[in-house]
Amino acid sequence: LVSLMLLSFIQIGKVKAGYKEYLRVSAEGGISGKVKPIFHLSKTGKNVILIFLDRAQNNFVEPMLEESPKLKEQFSGFTLYKNTVSFNSHTLIGAPPVHGGYEYTPAEINKRADKPLVEKHNEAILMLPRIFTEQGDNFSAASSDASWANYSWIPDISIFKPYPKIESFVTENAYLAQWYKDHQGVGNFTITSDTLKRNMLWYSFFRTSPLILRHVIYESGSYWSTNTQNEDLNKYLGNYAAMDYLKDLTDFSSKTENYFLSFTNNACHTSFALQAPDYVPSAKITDRGNSEYAGDNSYSSMAGVMHRLGEWLEYLKQNGVYENSRILIVSDHSCSSKEKPYKWDEKFSRISPGKYHPIFMFKDFNESGELKTNNDFMTNADSPTILLSGIIENAVNPFTGNPVNSKLKEDGALVTISNLYMPHHFSSKNIFTVKPDDWYRVSDNIFESKNWKQETMEESKK
């Protein structure tokens, strides 16, 4: 009995500590919940904008634009790179290449086996804002919601503290309560504060539980709630609200001539039905749209994000800052296992290549006209190169001293199909412990299985 009581006190202490850590990370989000400008673009200089939409699917873009001529016009000047591959089908491995380029692909991360994974992950997140503010000419920067920052489920933006020219925020869930106040007619859903309080408690259990039990406790983010409709809505709206308020979160008062923004949003990661044609949350869905994916909730939730993003782009145009803005819209991975463009065979049945087909849309300075498509072989690790091009020549990674470029792509992209997606899934703190035969080198046309060549990576055995 004494031992049981002692164990109980220890666990209670762990829960309190976990909850305290949750509050600390949440408090450092830098946002009070009040909707006001936090992103300050430049009216006269250059704006370089990275929009990271977690799990946004490349193959959905064209049907969305065909469905809405207005949306297509809002994305004027953009090029959709259809032949783009990602390096994994999960954020933990798939996000670092987006932020840090080819030095942070899974294979390259594993080569630096003397450094902890969390340290290399943080390097990737910090690389671009540091380059722009330290190697660029009169740049300030902002970053929001950087996925897995400091390997924390809620991004731990304390990693930005040493860099005063970089502002950092967590917008996820920050505006959820305000959104409900502004949209009281959305539905007869229970007030979100109870759900949030419940999840905060369960999150503390998650943080203090043995690693082997965390996946069970997390239960795909629902924490075993029986109110699945409300949980799905809150999960989606916690991110959607930031997209819906994006115009209100943006002004044009940059204190420096030039501005870099890295904005991450996770709304696409939750499949949820929205009301077409504008794809907005509604208590009753009477119109699912007329695209070929009309019944697909993943399509619907992404359409909601793209429509709000289109409204923001229109806002930039109205304020004269569209032409002086370079914008990249990219994701870490996709989610549909099987897509039409892929020529299906036994190899693709194992790989599920659609999961590695991220959105990659780019608009350069002064670009205009109808959206174009491009079939050049790309990876989402091309993001830093394309954003830095012509602005900071010979850019150098401030953490490694190596040049930032896309030369490693010349030999193809070394993709891992590993299904490990939480930090505790890896048996090493320094490398991704991927199965040796879970690697494929991808090149040229990603839709043909002959261009996915299996390789064995011995270092993954460490």
Predicted stretch roles:
Residues 1-462:
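Catalytic domains that recognize anionic headgroups
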